[in-house]
Amino acid sequence: MPNTRQAKKRMRRDAKRRLRNRYHLSRMRTYIKNFRRMIENGEIDKAKEYINEVISVIYHTAAKGVIHKNEAARRASRVYKLLNKALQQQQAQA
């Protein structure tokens, strides 16, 4: 339990920020999860259209300070890597 006014205020502020951060993290993870599902289900054309939204959400989350910019770059890289791998497999089958 906080003892000072400042500590009480900090707790209130942290609670608000925690909620906001959880929203952005959850949103980002959902977009990535949906993208992975598209790849797994073979919906590569949909995934190609959806990737711009996914990358945008990832970098937006970093801009809000929820994740570090290097983490955003790493996540974006992994998303692109998934798409490129799926595209290569699709071309190999054709």
UniProtKB/Swiss-Prot annotation:
Pfam families: Ribosomal_S20p
The keyword rRNA-binding belongs to this UniProt entry's keyword annotation: yes
Keywords: Ribonucleoprotein, Ribosomal protein, RNA-binding, rRNA-binding
GO molecular function: small ribosomal subunit rRNA binding; structural constituent of ribosome
Keyword RNA-binding part of the UniProt annotation: yes
GO cellular component: cytosol; small ribosomal subunit
SUPFAM superfamilies per record: Ribosomal protein S20
InterPro entries: Ribosomal_bS20, Ribosomal_bS20_sf
A single GO BP: translation
Role, per record: Binds directly to 16S ribosomal RNA.
Family membership: Belongs to the bacterial ribosomal protein bS20 family.
PANTHER family: 30S RIBOSOMAL PROTEIN S20 (PTHR33398), SMALL RIBOSOMAL SUBUNIT PROTEIN BS20C (PTHR33398:SF1)
Protein name (Swiss-Prot/TrEMBL): Small ribosomal subunit protein bS20
Gene that this polypeptide is encoded by: rpsT
